[in-house]
């Protein structure tokens, strides 16, 4: 065979492999079941932990990436996970599909799973405070990132391993949603509005209309990253809840600046130390707000800024807390003349300029915090549909700063600078114009209160779309005036600025970051699938790297006292 022909064959085979990786839906969790709390046998309240302990890996944050990362590493090494929140059995409403709105409605008492904050843009927002992270409080939408994200990420991915990591997650906690009336109508309207092609059911982020995966099963039970802890080795894995990590401990001995442990406090305010043994590491998985905050409090960040706060500079890192972005969420609420059934987001409309979806809801007396931009937004007195457009990327970047220079429990300040980049504003305008086309479809006619053409005839809750679909200035004003958070904020410790392509903090040994702070753009319309995969992926890469070096595997067995509340939770779970 000629060389050119052989090269062509190889190219075709490689493209086929990539196509299979990104287009085929592999096995999902296929039966509804209770949330699996088997892992509680190795979960402890931090008050019951030793004042000083040693572990191969210390993971700060038991959230979307932290849980799969911990489970993976525990197959070979001793692992401690430090989570500032508590467990889901303390808040059973987190475990149902109805809990999404309910948990946003609960007042923040300093312990609830949803921590409220208002960005310096003046927009309401939330972060998680529970084992399982945002996978315990979100809307359950599951998608894989697309090929272009990997190509532009600054990381040399092993795409076979990426695919295996996705499957590892999906087999445990991802479901194909059942048919929901409003979601079916949403899909029909997207297609009628020109969001093509019809991709049927699939998980990969790609242009067109599709039914995507969900972490809610068809009985309405939530499944989340905490359940992935069940895949870990219980003899090697310890999870401490209500453990607030205060700072990273560093050493400057002959090997250079090295992370050697962390200091954390329990709910009684007692200080503990967890130290790294052997060639282990500290891995930060505390999220977009928590990870940059902890780096700054530990003396890793912009030198002049740290000095101004009287924080001793351990390592000058000018980009810690920079490139913090949040995807704008703009929307229209319609109040149909007849009740519609509540539904979670399962149908997506994807284009290169915007991502769209919709949910339907019962009315409520207490507003779900951050569903609308501010608490002064009008409340629905009947069932309603919330039709959403998301700006990809985004290119508009903000920053994170400390509100307290000594107390990790005081949330940092963050400003996202929504739509400050003109490209983002253009994408928002395009998206909201497409929602105008969506509202004008035949599929949406039964949801009008008056039989009027185009976008007219709907009972709109809040700000309506501009009447003139060609008035870009009016749409730009709409985008600025109605912006809300999509809860998909990211960045602050990004690849190429703070960490390298192996997720190691540059200039510091034994310190990595594996969470949503690592990339300056959202990896898909809904990012939880990517970050679940990322925990498994990086954990597997670490095990492979250490195994290839011929290191002996270190294991240890933990037998501290179970806290009383977890004993009762165990009896509840089983």
Curated annotation (Swiss-Prot):
Protein name in UniProt: (R)-mandelonitrile lyase 4
Chief subcellular location: other
Catalytic residues of the enzyme: 488 (proton donor), 526 (proton acceptor)
GO molecular function: flavin adenine dinucleotide binding; mandelonitrile lyase activity; oxidoreductase activity, acting on CH-OH group of donors
Protein's UniProt keywords contain Lyase: yes
S-S bridge residues: 428-479
Cross-referenced InterPro entries: FAD/NAD-bd_sf, GMC_Oxidoreductase-Related, GMC_OxRdtase, GMC_OxRdtase_N, GMC_OxRtase_C
SUPFAM superfamilies (UniProt xref): FAD-linked reductases, C-terminal domain, FAD/NAD(P)-binding domain
Organism: Prunus serotina
EC id: 4.1.2.10
Residues carrying sugar: 30, 76, 146, 151, 179, 268, 310, 381, 407, 468
Record's function text: Involved in cyanogenesis, the release of HCN from injured tissues. Catalyzes the stereospecific addition of HCN to a variety of aldehydes in vitro. It is a major seed constituent, and could have the additional role of a storage form for reduced nitrogen.
Catalysed reactions, semicolon-separated: (R)-mandelonitrile = benzaldehyde + hydrogen cyanide
GO cellular component, one term: vacuole
Cross-referenced Pfam families: GMC_oxred_C, GMC_oxred_N
Assembly mode: Monomer.
Localization terms from the record: Vacuole, Aleurone grain
Record bears the keyword Lyase: yes
Chain residues that bind FAD: 64-65, 83-84, 134, 138-141, 245, 487-488, 516, 527-528
Residues reported to bind substrate: 357, 486
Cofactor or coenzyme needed: FAD
Family of the protein in this entry: Belongs to the GMC oxidoreductase family.
Keyword line: Disulfide bond, FAD, Flavoprotein, Glycoprotein, Lyase, Signal, Vacuole
Signal sequence region: 1-27
